[in-house]
């Protein structure tokens, strides 16, 4: 649509749908003439008014001719804003008559050279850039338009989402956090430790040993293992890898070393280690005389194997290889596998809530995951069904089953029934896991007061690997607050989680939202912090979450460029 108001301040936000203003073009012209001005200005205004009239009458060739006459009459050195309108209006005509996107783009650029805060020119340039295959540039120009006029967000959301899915993602290199090599001891992924420990209402080798590990005679390898257990109790998880040496040949120590390597900055090291010592672990487990301890070690090793798998196909193949008559083993493995999937799903629901209330500029990152969320839900349900065939579900597993049914229910009465079932489970066993999950359900149903009470109760449990998830859940309490307050409190929640777990994926994504918010451009200080948040989040991000972070790189770069073009960086 062409620009029609001759005397308006072009630095003001221009709304899509400005066509209605065309009806008052004549009035605008008379007002302009009453102000006086140079002969050239009056001539250009007359030409623009004629072009607008022809455009309104759908005589696009005639309108294009008029705007071209105005551009030529203005000359190359004109800085009058009416010249920017002539270029932008000619670009609109070029669209209508089917001219090359390069010609459209050239007119938009000429308009922006005169008026660098011309909203319509940025929007039309973005579409032309997309048409010539320059999606990254198009994203920057679109965000500049969003910055000048936030009302464009909704009307151009589909276009924005298309630009955000920039390929190939191989060009989006994240890199390591700054000075990560200087961090001693090297960090481990606390959310992975939580994922493992959330199955501890099922008998576990390490839960058993943490409660009591007192062999009559301790070998040096067992002493090393005992010391590792003590450090685990104190929350010093990062120290375990250096403590449990590669030479240790005590099976529980070897399995624990493999687990901690899988939670490290280089999880492939765990695969290499298990490839090297796996046969020896199996041999040592087989020679264990205590049958109960043999089963515990075997199950612990099986769970480690699951943790090292990357695809559901690998997981299903492994589970199918377990003898069908070994129900106890099948129950434990299917139970852990379901938790393995559910924790990932839990991250998605949190991210969805945070993105939903922090503006559309990051929403698309979540919608890309919708199908995977449903796939994870289906896989978790399937694994839990198999677990239930082989044993009685524990309180945690029962809570998860009900939660999954709640998330997929479309019946109002059934939703309330599932919530009540979860409330009863949480009341009967007030573990940190149950309290935080129940608080999430309350937030999903807008029961902020009940959610807050449960989180306060959960705060009494201070086990280190549990604390970050509670802080992250606390962020959900602020989603309905005014934007400035919401962003401040969101940042506080993220910082609290990061203080305990410096490289928590979800916390850094939350921090990214809190420091940058929904703004379509970004200032220098926030840009540098945002990029470091992405690097920190990527350190332990699972493969799919890593893809989401990679998609944030072109977005942040486009935000930066938008700010630079508008002199706001």
Swiss-Prot record:
Q: Does the keyword Metal-binding apply?
A: no
Q: Which residues lie on this side of the membrane: Cytoplasmic?
A: 33-569
Q: Which GO terms describe its cellular component?
A: mitochondrial outer membrane; mitochondrion
Q: Does the keyword Cell inner membrane apply?
A: no
The transmembrane residues are 13-32
Q: Name one GO molecular function term.
A: mitochondrion targeting sequence binding
What Gene3D superfamilies would the database entry show? Tetratricopeptide repeat domain (1.25.40.10)
Provide the free-text tissue specificity comment from this protein's UniProt record: Expressed in body wall muscle cells, the pharynx and structures in the tail.
One GO BP annotation here? positive regulation of defense response to virus by host
Q: Which residues lie on this side of the membrane: Mitochondrial intermembrane?
A: 1-12
Q: Which domain of life is it from?
A: Eukaryota
Q: How does it sit in the membrane?
A: Single-pass membrane protein
Q: Where in the cell is it found?
A: Mitochondrion outer membrane
Family, per the entry? Belongs to the Tom70 family.
| Subunit-level organization | Forms part of the preprotein translocase complex of the outer mitochondrial membrane (TOM complex).
Protein name, please? Answer: Mitochondrial import receptor subunit tomm-70
What organism, scientifically named, is this protein from?
Answer: Caenorhabditis elegans
Taxonomic lineage from the root: Eukaryota, Metazoa, Ecdysozoa, Nematoda, Chromadorea
């Amino acid at each position: 649509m062409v620009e029609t108001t001759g005397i308006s301040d072009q630095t003001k936000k221009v709304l899509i749908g400005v066509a209605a203003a065309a009806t008052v073009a004549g009035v605008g012209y008379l007002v302009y003439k009453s102000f006086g001005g140079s002969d050239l200005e009056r001539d250009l205004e007359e030409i623009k008014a004629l072009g607008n009239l022809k455009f309104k009458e759908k005589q696009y060739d005639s309108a294009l001719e008029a705007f071209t006459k105005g551009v030529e009459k203005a000359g190359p050195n004109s800085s009058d804003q009416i010249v920017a309108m002539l270029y932008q209006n000619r670009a609109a005509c070029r669209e209508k008559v089917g001219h090359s996107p390069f010609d459209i783009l050239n007119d938009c650029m000429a308009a922006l050279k005169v008026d660098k805060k011309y909203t319509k020119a940025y929007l039309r340039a973005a579409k032309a850039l997309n048409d010539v295959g320059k999606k990254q540039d198009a994203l920057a120009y679109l965000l500049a338009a969003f910055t000048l006029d936030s009302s464009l967000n909704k009307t151009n959301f589909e276009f924005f989402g298309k630009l955000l899915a920039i390929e190939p993602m191989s060009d989006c290199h994240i890199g390591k956090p700054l000075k990560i090599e200087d961090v001693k001891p090297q960090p481990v992924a606390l959310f992975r430790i939580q994922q493992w420990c959330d199955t501890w209402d099922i008998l576990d080798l390490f839960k058993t040993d943490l409660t009591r590990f007192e062999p009559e005679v301790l070998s040096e390898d067992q002493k090393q293992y005992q010391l590792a257990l003590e450090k685990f109790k104190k929350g010093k998880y990062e120290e375990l890898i250096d403590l449990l040496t590669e030479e240790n040949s005590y099976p529980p120590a070897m399995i624990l070393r493999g687990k901690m390597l899988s939670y490290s900055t280089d999880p492939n090291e765990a695969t290499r280690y298990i490839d090297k010592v796996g046969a020896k672990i199996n041999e040592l487990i087989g020679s264990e005389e205590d049958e109960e301890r043999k089963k515990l070690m075997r199950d612990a090793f099986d769970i480690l194997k699951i943790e090292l798998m990357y695809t559901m196909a690998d997981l299903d193949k492994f589970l199918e290889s377990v003898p069908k008559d070994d129900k106890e083993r099948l129950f434990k493995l299917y139970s852990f596998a379901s938790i393995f999937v559910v924790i990932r799903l839990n991250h998605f629901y949190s991210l969805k809530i945070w993105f939903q209330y922090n503006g559309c500029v990051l929403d698309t990152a979540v919608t890309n995951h919708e199908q995977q969320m449903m796939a994870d839900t289906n896989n978790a349900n399937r694994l839990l069904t198999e677990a239930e065939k082989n044993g009685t579900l524990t309180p945690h597993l029962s809570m998860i089953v009900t939660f999954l049914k709640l998330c997929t229910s479309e019946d109002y009465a059934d939703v309330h029934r599932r919530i009540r079932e979860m409330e009863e489970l949480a009341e009967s066993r007030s573990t940190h896991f149950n309290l935080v999950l129940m608080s999430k359900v309350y937030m999903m149903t807008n029961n902020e007061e009940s959610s807050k009470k449960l989180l306060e109760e959960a705060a009494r449990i201070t086990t280190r690997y549990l604390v970050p998830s509670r802080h992250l859940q606390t962020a959900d309490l602020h989603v309905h607050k005014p934007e400035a307050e919401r962003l401040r409190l969101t940042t506080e929640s993220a910082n609290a989680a990061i203080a305990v777990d410096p490289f928590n994926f979800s916390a850094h994504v939350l921090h990214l939202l809190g420091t940058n918010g929904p703004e379509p451009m970004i200032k220098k200080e926030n840009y540098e912090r945002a990029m470091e948040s992405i690097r920190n989040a990527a350190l332990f991000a699972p493969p799919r979450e890593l893809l989401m972070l990679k998609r944030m790189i072109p977005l942040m770069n486009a935000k930066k460029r938008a700010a630079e073009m508008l002199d706001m960086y």
